[in-house]
Amino acid sequence: MKNLTRRNFNTLMAKGMGSAAIMAVTPMACAMGTGQDKKKLGIALVGLGSYSTYQLAPALQDTQHCYLAGIVTGTPEKEKIWADKYNIPKKNIYNYQNFDDIAKNDDIDVVYVVLPNSMHAEFCIRAAKAGKHVICEKPMAVSVEECDAIIDACNKAGVKLGIGYRLQSEPYTNEVKRFVRENTFGKIRYVSADAGYYSGGNPDQWRLNKELSGGGALLNMGVYAIQSTIYGSGQNPISVTAQEYSTRPEYFKDTDETITAQFEFPNGAVGNIMTSHNINANSMYVSAETGWFQLQPANNYGPLSGKTSKGDVIEFPHESQQKLQMDDFSKHVLFDAPNIAPGEMGKRDMIICAAIYESIAKGGQKVMLNLEPGYGFGGIPTS
């Protein structure tokens, strides 16, 4: 079988060969590389698309607690390019067929899955079975059931699991969390968040293919807006009502283009989100009893910007969000620091996404949510 890539993944699945052929490699059990005796953890990037190429790999040149140790790619031409650029030894380069052999490699402590959404669960589970800690890029999966499977696999293997929520580590977001946690502006009454961009590129890109992406704007950018309303209110929502809009059906053939949703929170606060692959949007706003605060931009790669009703400008030195994120996860593994973006957070957000889709399918009816408390400010439960 040819090496698996984003380009031939659909073909394999259509022939009924995808998961069966990929999983034909016998899983190997080995002792987990804990990294406890290392100064830095070795990270292997699984999938060398634009995010790995332009964000993660450069960030790993500046991280303090981890480094780029290996790669997994289905494109042979990329192997030499990456090996030469980042001095990656041949023994640390894998494809999707021999991926399970990574279990034997003590150079690699963490596997970062950066594949199309529908492939997250499979490779996170395989990484856990190989005894490697796991970072799963957002969204965690394409269903709540897949989230559960990933969490269970990591728990059984005794490995750590984190979700690639870069904003949870960056200072502007953490300042918003502080405002809410310390009641700087009193009780939160309203929060809104927008996250989107205009997609006008290749109509065959995997994000526009539901078989690969699992959804459209909601699973891609919408998770940022959902997270903003949660840490902006300090609570998980108790209900959601949602609507979908399509103005370019010829382009967005089987994925959602634009979605709006309204949340209710336990303390009486309300929230609104808008997410789109057709509208440029990048902000969050919180109104409280004695004032307001906002970030705009709020969810791009930075630098971000913010201000408050007191006239204060929210400003921090710019650092790579990906660098901060991967260092935070590495500190969790190495020093048992809090896991600020655990698998449970990824699952929570997938439950909310599923409820949004359910509301849309029911013509905008309210859908009640029964979420476990916590994960409102980060990995440390709030209640």
PLM regions with names:
Residues 1-20:
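N-terminal secretory signal peptides and thylakoid transit peptides that target proteins
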Residues 16, 312-383:
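C-terminal helical cap and adjacent loop that interface with cofactors, partners, or active-site loops
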Residues 24-62:
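C-terminal segment of N-terminal export signals and the immediately downstream linker at the start
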Residues 65-86:
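NAD(P)-binding Rossmann-fold cofactor-contacting core
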Residues 91-153, 381:
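Beta-loop-alpha module in the N-terminal Rossmann-like domain of NAD(P)-dependent dehydrogenases
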Residues 149-166, 189:
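Rossmann-fold dehydrogenase core element
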Residues 167-252, 363:
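Predominantly a Rossmann-like dinucleotide-binding segment in NAD(P)-dependent oxidoreductases
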Residues 250-256, 264-327, 342, 356, ...:
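NAD(P)-dinucleotide binding in Rossmann-like oxidoreductases
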